[in-house]
C-alpha cells in the first residue's frame, strides 16, 4: 500500500446495531488490521429527528462484544461526533458561497412539491431547477430581499456541474461513473436548521480525518458522485471507495429486511440469546467475502491474517440462519464448560433451574446447543412429570415389545440402591434387560430413551438417566406405561 491506511465506521445513533452495519464495521476493521492501518469510529448524529437516546453507547457496546477494538473514537478524541463539528462544516460552506460554488436557496417545500408534480405530469425526470434561472442580478436581489422579508430561512445548495463526469474505480465493483446531469440538479448541502446534509458532512469528515478508503454497503453508490462533487469543489483528492454487495435472505432471495421477523438481525438479539461472539464474528466475516478453500471456521486472528479485499464478492451475500446456527453450535461444542456454564446461569436462574446438577446439565447438552438459551427447552424433561411426544415418537412406543422392555428396565432401576445409582452402572442394567428379554438394538434402547427423555435423540442415555434421578426416571417410565396402555 502506497499510503497510510485509515478507514472508518460511521454509524448513526438511530437504533440497535444491525447485522448489515456490523458487517460494514467488521470489514473495515479487518482491512485496517490486515494492513497495519488505523480503524476509527465517527458518530454521524446530524439527523436529530431519528436520534435515539443511548444509541451511541449501544453501537459501541455491541461492537466490543463482537470482539472489535478501534484506534480513534469519540471516547478518546474530540470532535468525532458530527454534532460537534458544525463550525468546521460552516467554514467550508462559507468558502463555497464566497467562491460562487454554492448558493442560498429560498424555494419553499410547497413550491418544490408543485414543481415535482408538474414534472411528473409532463413525464420529466424529477430534478431541482435553479430558482434564479433567467433572473438578472437586480431581479435576483429583489427576490432574495422579498423572501427574507417573509421570514423564509434558506438552505444552501451546491452548484452542480451538469456536464461533469464523476467516476471512480470501486474496490469491489470496478469502474463506476455518473453524469452530473443525472443526479437531480443542485442539491442541498446545508439544511434550514443549520445542520449539513449527509453527503456534504461525510465528505468533509473523511477529508479532515484523512480517510484513505471508504468501505461501505452498495446502497451508498448513489451517494458517491455527490461526495465526489464536494471534493472537486474544494480541490481535494478523494479517498478510494469500495461498495459491498447487499445482504439477501437465503430463504426468500430478497434483500434482508427488518420486517423479516423469522431472522435475527440485530447483534443485541444474539447477545441476549447466548450466542458466542466469536461465532457471530466468524459468520459475519463470511457475508460477502471468503478466503478460498473449504474451511469456514476461523478465529479473529486468522481472519485478520487471511483478509484480502480482492476477494470481496460481487454477488449478493446470503444470510443463512441455519448456517449461523451450525457455526454457533461448533463454537459452543468446542468452548470450555466454565464459559458456557457462566453464560447459562442467568437463563437457569430465571427458570428456577440453577440446582446442584445445573453444571452437569450444561455439560450434557452443550454439544446440542446453537445458543445458550436453549439450555431451558433442552432440560425441560428434568423439570416436568411427563414429556410431550411427537407423532414419530408415539409410533415407536406402539411397538409390541415396548411394555416388556419398560417393565424390565423399571425393575432394574427399582432394585438399584442409591449408592449404586451412578452413570457407569446404568448401561449394564440396560444390557441385563437385553439378556433377559432377548430384545436388542433400537427395539431396546429407543423405548427406554423416549420413556425417560421424551426424545428419540439426545445425550448419552446413562448420563440422562443419572441426571434425571432414579425416582424421576421410574416415574417417567410408569407414566409412559400408563399412556401406552390406554
Curated annotation (Swiss-Prot):
The record's subcellular locations are: Cytoplasm
State where ATP binds.
258
User: InterPro entries given for it?
Assistant: aa-tRNA-synth_I_cd-bd, aa-tRNA-synth_I_codon-bd_sub2, aa-tRNA-synth_I_CS, aa_tRNA-synth_I_cd-bd_sf, Glu-tRNA-ligase_bac/mito, Glu/Gln-tRNA-synth, Glu/Gln-tRNA-synth_Ib_cat-dom, GluQ/Sye
Q: Which reaction does it catalyse?
A: tRNA(Glu) + L-glutamate + ATP = L-glutamyl-tRNA(Glu) + AMP + diphosphate
Residues in coiled coil: none
The entry lists its GO molecular-function terms as: ATP binding; glutamate-tRNA ligase activity; tRNA binding; zinc ion binding
Tell me, which GO biological process terms does this entry list?
glutamyl-tRNA aminoacylation
UniProt motif 'HIGH' region: location:
11-21
The record's principal subcellular location, in a coarse class, is cytoplasm
Residues forming the motif 'KMSKS' region are 255-259
Question: What Enzyme Commission number(s) does the record list for this chain?
Answer: 6.1.1.17
Q: Which GO terms describe its cellular component?
A: cytosol
Q: Into which EC class is this enzyme placed?
A: ligase
Q: Which UniProt keywords apply?
A: Aminoacyl-tRNA synthetase, ATP-binding, Cytoplasm, Ligase, Nucleotide-binding, Protein biosynthesis
In the record, the note on similarity to other proteins reads: Belongs to the class-I aminoacyl-tRNA synthetase family. Glutamate--tRNA ligase type 1 subfamily.
The record describes its quaternary structure and partners as: Monomer.
- Main function: Catalyzes the attachment of glutamate to tRNA(Glu) in a two-step reaction: glutamate is first activated by ATP to form Glu-AMP and then transferred to the acceptor end of tRNA(Glu).
Annotated protein name in UniProt: Glutamate--tRNA ligase
Q: Quick one: which gene encodes this? A: gltX
Amino acid at each position: 500500500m502506497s499510503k497510510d491506511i485509515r478507514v472508518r465506521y460511521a454509524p448513526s445513533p438511530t437504533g440497535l446495531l444491525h447485522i448489515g452495519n456490523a458487517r460494514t464495521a467488521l470489514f473495515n476493521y479487518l482491512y485496517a488490521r490486515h494492513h497495519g492501518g488505523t480503524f476509527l469510529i465517527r458518530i454521524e448524529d446530524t439527523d436529530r429527528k431519528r436520534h435515539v437516546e443511548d444509541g451511541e453507547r449501544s453501537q459501541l457496546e455491541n461492537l466490543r462484544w463482537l470482539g472489535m477494538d478501534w484506534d480513534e473514537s469519540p471516547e478518546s478524541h474530540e470532535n468525532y461526533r458530527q454534532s460537534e463539528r458544525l463550525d468546521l462544516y460552516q467554514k467550508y460552506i462559507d468558502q463555497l458561497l464566497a467562491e460562487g460554488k454554492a448558493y442560498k436557496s429560498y424555494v419553499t417545500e410547497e413550491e418544490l412539491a408543485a414543481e415535482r408534480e408538474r414534472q411528473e405530469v409532463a413525464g420529466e425526470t424529477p430534478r431541482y431547477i435553479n430558482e434564479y434561472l433567467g433572473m438578472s442580478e437586480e431581479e435576483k436581489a429583489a427576490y432574495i430581499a422579498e423572501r427574507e422579508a417573509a421570514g423564509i430561512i434558506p438552505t444552501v445548495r451546491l452548484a452542480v456541474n451538469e456536464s461533469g463526469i464523476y467516476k471512480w474505480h470501486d474496490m469491489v465493483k470496478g469502474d463506476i461513473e455518473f453524469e452530473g446531469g443525472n443526479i437531480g440538479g443542485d442539491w442541498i448541502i446545508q439544511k434550514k436548521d443549520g445542520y449539513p446534509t449527509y453527503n456534504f458532512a461525510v465528505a468533509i469528515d473523511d477529508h479532515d480525518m484523512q480517510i484513505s478508503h471508504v468501505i461501505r454497503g452498495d446502497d451508498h453508490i448513489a451517494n458517491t458522485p455527490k461526495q465526489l462533487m464536494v471534493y472537486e469543489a474544494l480541490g481535494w483528492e478523494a479517498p478510494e471507495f469500495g461498495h459491498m454487495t447487499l445482504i439477501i435472505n437465503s430463504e426468500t432471495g430478497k434483500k434482508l429486511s427488518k420486517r423479516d421477523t423469522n431472522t435475527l438481525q440485530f447483534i443485541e438479539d444474539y447477545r441476549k440469546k447466548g450466542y458466542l461472539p466469536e461465532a457471530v464474528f466468524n459468520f459475519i466475516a463470511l457475508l460477502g467475502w471468503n478466503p478460498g478453500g473449504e474451511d469456514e471456521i476461523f478465529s479473529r486472528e486468522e481472519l485478520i491474517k487471511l483478509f484480502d479485499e480482492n476477494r470481496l464478492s460481487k454477488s449478493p451475500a446470503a444470510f443463512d440462519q441455519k448456517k449461523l446456527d451450525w457455526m454457533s453450535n461448533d463454537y459452543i461444542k468446542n468452548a470450555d464448560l466454565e464459559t458456557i456454564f457462566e453464560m447459562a446461569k442467568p437463563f437457569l436462574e430465571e427458570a428456577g433451574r440453577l440446582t446442584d446438577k445445573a453444571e452437569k446439565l450444561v455439560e450434557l447438552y452443550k454439544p446440542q446447543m446453537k445458543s445458550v438459551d436453549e439450555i431451558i427447552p433442552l432440560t425441560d424433561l428434568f423439570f416436568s412429570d411427563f414429556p410431550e411426544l411427537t407423532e414419530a415418537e408415539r409410533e415407536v412406543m406402539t411397538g409390541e415389545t415396548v411394555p416388556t422392555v419398560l417393565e424390565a428396565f423399571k425393575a432394574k432401576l427399582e432394585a438399584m440402591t442409591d449408592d449404586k445409582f451412578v452413570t457407569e452402572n446404568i448401561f449394564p442394567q440396560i444390557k441385563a434387560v437385553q439378556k433377559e428379554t432377548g430384545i436388542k438394538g433400537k427395539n431396546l434402547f429407543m423405548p427406554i430413551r423416549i420413556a425417560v427423555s421424551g426424545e428419540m435423540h439426545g445425550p448419552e442415555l446413562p448420563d440422562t438417566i443419572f441426571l434425571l434421578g432414579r425416582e424421576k426416571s421410574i416415574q417417567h417410565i410408569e407414566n409412559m406405561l400408563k399412556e401406552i396402555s390406554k
